[in-house]
Design a protein with these regions (language model features):
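Basic, Lys/Arg-enriched alpha-helical interface segments
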Residues: 1-71, 80-84, 91-120
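Hydrophobic/aromatic beta-strand elements that line small-molecule binding cavities or substrate pockets
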Residues: 74-76
Length: 120
């Protein structure tokens, strides 16, 4: 059984830019997303880890391999229909803590906006 994977506009724009800028890393992200589609919520470390300090208790990060010196992360959560929603992606290399501090609130808002829209 394949799990459904949905994306936000923010994730789609980031991934499109990644394909142009760093095809090797984009390929590794695509492989990690394929694993998520295959395993769903059962996918764990090292590819998936729970985000600490989020208001959304089930916010997670996808941790694909990355090319060169990049440390690609994709923040995601499973929605009420158990589809994986890829919220946003980025490269945290060189600013590990700041990347989370800046992006977790954005991911939380994207998720809340998505679930509110889905309820309408």
């Amino acid at each position: 059984v394949a799990w459904s994977v949905k994306v936000t506009e923010e994730y789609a724009a980031w991934f499109t830019a990644l394909i142009k800028d760093d095809l090797a890393s984009a390929t590794q992200v695509a492989e990690a997303v394929a694993a998520l589609r295959e395993e769903g919520p059962a996918l764990g470390r090292p590819l998936v880890d729970r985000i600490q300090g989020s208001r959304i208790h089930h916010l997670k990060e996808l941790r694909p391999g990355s090319a060169a010196r990049s440390e690609i992360r994709v923040l995601f959560a499973f929605d009420p229909t158990r589809s994986a929603l890829l919220l946003l992606g980025g490269d945290k290399a060189g600013n590990w803590q700041r990347w989370y501090k800046e992006n977790i609130p954005i991911a939380e808002q994207l998720y809340l906006d998505y679930t509110a829209q889905a309820e309408e």
